Amino acid sequence: YIHGKTGIDIHPAASIGRSFFIDHGTGVVIGATAVIGNDVKIYQGVTLGALQVDKSLANVKRHPTIEDNCILYANSTILGGRTVVGHDSVIGGNSWLTESVPPFSIVLHQSQVKVRTKPFEEPVNFVI
């Protein structure tokens, strides 16, 4: 019911600390064994998910731990039960994280778009 109203999926077994804040929550997914510390902020499209799904893993920690005072920006994906985001860290938008990062980390996704690799033979005139 609530997913239909908010677009947010938080498994009821997830552990969430005090002063947890979701801004623009559409697309947020928080798995069953996720642990979120105090004073954590997350933005739209963030996934705290598992690396794999199997019935044999039902009683195993499959989702990440986010320690206190972290910010997870839009569309960041953090996967795995052994993945820990250390306290006071920032995970930038569109980041993909499957390994732990220490406290006070800043993780960024940098897209590299190469438009052209060889120089123009003549000057290019653009008319706008």
Where would I find each of the regions flagged by the language model?
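Left-handed beta-helix
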Residues: 6, 11-12, 17-18, 23-32, ...
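PLP-dependent aminotransferase-like
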Residues: 53-54
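Terminal amphipathic alpha-helical/low-complexity segments used for targeting or macromolecular assembly
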Residues: 1-6, 119-128
